[in-house]
Amino acid sequence: QEQFAQDGVPPAAAGVIAPLFTREIQHWAPQIVAWAAEFGLDPNMAATVMQIESCGDPNAVSSAGAQGLFQVMPFHFASGENMQDPETNARRGMAYLAQGMQLTGGDTGLSFAGYNGGHGTAAKGWGAWPSETQRYYTWATGIYKDAATGAGTSETLNQWLAAGGASLCQQAAARLGIQ
């Protein structure tokens, strides 16, 4: 009998990310698998966060000041750490995502919401979330469900790309030298 997580999504095959992620995310696949394993996370969950946050651009910076592959806020780093170093950024991002999984009893949706809006905000429920966190939850849970079930494509990912994600991915591809 197949094991399912609390939210009904089966765990990913060990050591891989789903083929539905964009080429910019696939570029980082071996590292994503290693980073996720270090924190006991499903690599598809980590890939989902990277997809939405930076589309694989290690030098991405948001208007709010979040930086790097996982768009981690500066206060999560120790003094002197390079926030855009992929290894450092991933470890800080994965630690925060793993904290969300612990706080929510393994609820991936609430963990995604917490990653975006803060774990305290996520605990307040949908109605108290900013619209950005509601959108993030919708994108992340849809993409992750498709990825975790082994789908080769994701309608939710396509919707995210059409809603502006494609420009983020074009920027990432240029930075990574992907044609």
Where are these regions (language model features)?
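Surface-exposed patches in mature extracellular/periplasmic domains of secreted proteins
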Residues: 44-48, 60, 105-114, 151-154
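An acidic, Gly/Ser/Thr/Pro-rich helix-cap/linker signature
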Residues: 1-18, 156-179
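Sec-exported extracytoplasmic/periplasmic mature domains
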Residues: 33, 37-38, 51-55, 74, ...
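Soluble non-cytosolic domains of exported or imported proteins
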Residues: 19-27, 36-44, 63, 67, ...
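Catalytic and substrate-binding regions of cell-wall glycan-acting enzymes that process beta-1,4-linked
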Residues: 76, 88, 111-161
